C-alpha cells in the first residue's frame, strides 16, 4: 500500500550541514556498545531512552541559525544526518525519540545488525567512515559540523575525515562522557583522552564539552553558532 515519507533535497546553494552520532551523543545509552546495538535491535521502548541534556537545543540552534544565510528553503533548516552503528529496523523508534525530545528532523545513516560476508559482526567504525566519505562525494559543496562523543571512536573517525576532506568539515564538537558512562563503555573510570583531535587541521575548529549546553557555550565563545571558520 502507498506510504508517505518526508524528502529533504539538499540544493547546490546550501553549504552547511550537521552530522551527529546517536548513542551517548543525543541519547544516553549507559551500556557497552555491542550490548547497546543488541538492545536497539530487539527492544522498542522509546520511553526508556533519555536525552543528553542540551543536545536538542544545540542541534536545533546549529541547523536554524545558519539557514537564512546558507540558501536553505523557507520553512526548513540546514540538513542534519544522524549517523549510527545501530540497525535500520530501529529507525522508527529512534525517530520517535528524537521528535519527542525536540531534536531537528533529519536523515539516518544506519547499518545492518548481524553477520556480514567478512565476519560475524560488522565494523561500526568502518560504517561511519564509509558514510562520511559518501556524504563528501554526494555533497561536495556542503561543509559538515561533526558531532559525537569520546566514548568510542568518534574523535578518531572525525579527525581522519577532517584530514582527508578538510574542505568538507566546518568543525568538530565532541561530548565528553561522565565517569560512569566511561566505565560502562571502557570498564574504567578514567576519561579517554582523544589524542586524535590534535591531528585535526588547524583551520578546523574543535570543541569539547560535557553536554549540549557546554558545547553551545564553547561554540558561541568563538563568535558563531552557525557555519564555523577558523580555530
Pin down the residues of each PLM region:
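C-terminal cap/substrate-recognition subdomain and adjoining C-terminal extension
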Residues: 86-231
Amino acid at each position: 500500500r502507498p506510504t508517505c515519507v518526508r524528502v529533504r533535497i539538499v540544493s547546490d546553494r546550501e553549504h552547511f550541514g550537521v552530522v551527529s552520532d546517536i548513542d551517548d551523543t543525543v541519547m544516553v545509552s549507559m551500556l557497552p556498545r555491542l550490548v547497546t546495538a543488541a538492545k536497539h535491535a530487539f527492544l522498542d521502548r522509546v520511553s526508556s531512552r533519555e536525552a543528553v541534556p542540551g543536545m536538542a537545543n544545540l542541534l536545533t540552534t546549529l541547523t536554524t541559525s545558519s539557514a537564512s544565510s546558507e540558501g536553505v528553503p523557507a520553512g526548513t533548516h540546514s540538513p542534519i544526518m544522524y549517523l549510527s552503528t545501530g540497525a535500520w529496523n530501529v529507525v522508527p523508534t529512534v525517530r520517535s525519540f528524537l521528535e519527542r525530545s525536540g531534536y531537528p528532523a533529519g536523515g539516518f545513516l544506519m547499518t545492518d545488525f548481524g553477520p556480514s560476508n567478512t565476519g560475524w559482526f560488522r565494523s561500526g567504525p568502518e560504517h561511519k567512515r564509509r558514510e562520511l566519505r559518501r556524504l563528501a562525494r554526494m555533497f561536495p559543496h556542503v561543509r559538515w559540523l561533526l558531532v559525537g562523543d569520546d566514548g568510542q571512536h568518534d574523535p578518531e573517525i572525525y579527525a581522519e575525515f577532517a584530514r582527508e576532506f578538510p574542505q568538507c568539515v566546518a568543525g568538530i564538537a565532541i561530548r565528553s562522557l561522565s565517569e560512569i558512562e566511561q566505565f560502562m563503555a571502557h570498564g574504567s573510570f578514567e576519561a579517554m583522552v582523544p589524542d586524535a583531535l590534535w591531528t585535526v587541521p588547524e583551520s578546523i575548529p574543535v570543541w569539547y564539552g560535557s553536554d549540549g549546553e557546554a558545547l553551545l557555550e564553547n561554540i558561541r565563545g568563538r563568535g558563531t553558532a552557525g557555519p564555523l571558520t577558523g580555530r
